[in-house]
Amino acid sequence: MRLPFELYIALRYLLARRRQAFISLISVISTVGVAVGVMALLIALALMTGLQQELRDRIVGSAGHIYVWKLGESGLAEYEVELERLRQVPRVTRAAPVILGQALATTDTSEAFITLKGIDPNLEADVTEIGSAIRDGTLDALAPSGAGTLEGLVIGEGLAAKLGAFVGDEVTLLTPQGRLSPMGVMPRARQFRIVGLFDMGLHEFDTSYAYVRLDVAARLLDRTGADFIELKVDDLYAAPDVAESITRELGTSYLTQDWSDLNRSLFSALWLEKMAISITIGLIVLVAALNIVASLVLLVMDKSRDIA
């Protein structure tokens, strides 16, 4: 069977004789070098992209897409009205009020400084992924308890490990918002019962955050209404545009921030690392490609007499 002319010519010059074996070896090594370099580049880019997406999903899952504050002394004292206004903004799908403060959590064996987050359990579960992150217990247990029973507290698994506590154990929270006494300002203290443990996949979050009901946090931290409102939008990447539209529609008395603003330094560092890896591996591919060019030049020079 006769081979096609093009295939015959290709095989003739690819299958080198003994004196051409060195050139063919260089070609093979260079080709393999390019293949390995490209493979390493694709794997590195895939890993960095996957890391960025996973980190983004975990960060956004632990909080809302947009935060809204109201400037002034009254702030969000009547947050129910603000919730309804914000729900009317295009592309906003969910809204939840939040109170945030610092406290000292103590048990019989340990203590830790925590960030206390007051929430409406039903609304918060719609805005963030806290509901699906519960590993033991339930977020619904934060509902108002009966007379004489302790209020519920949901904490991260990392924080539970630091305190040596489990679901059902009692924890005392102390806040600096206390009352004046002859001894000075006495911290406000209140006992809680752990009703749930969560794991958001973020070490800092899981080791320092605790959730209580909004009205409980207001009394404990001496707040009125809510500190800010978390919003969820229909498209994660539309959050910056929606935040700008909220400021335009509601006026300059409102301050907004989206998830990308709050984590800009982190994602910028990841982007720079991704670019550095791409450039480094790209140079490796370039060196291998130059070897291929060199081997082809040698091959052409060797075969120049055979070219009519």
What do these predicted regions represent?
Residues Q52-L83:
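Membrane-interface junction motifs in transport/secretion proteins
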Residues M1-V38:
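N-terminal Sec/SRP start-transfer signal
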Residues L14, I59, R85-P90, I246:
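Hydrophobic C-terminal alpha-helix "anchor/cap" residues
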Residues I23-T49, W271-A308:
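Hydrophobic alpha-helical transmembrane segments of multi-pass inner-membrane transport and secretion
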Residues Q177-G178, V185-I277:
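Mechanotransmission and gating elements of multispan inner-membrane complexes involved in transport
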Residues E80, E84-T224:
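A structural signal for hydrophobic secondary-structure junctions
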Residues Y13-L14, E54, R58, L220, ...:
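Amphipathic alpha-helical segments that mediate coupling or scaffolding at interfaces
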Residues L3, L7, L11, W259-N263, ...:
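Alpha-helical membrane-protein architecture signal
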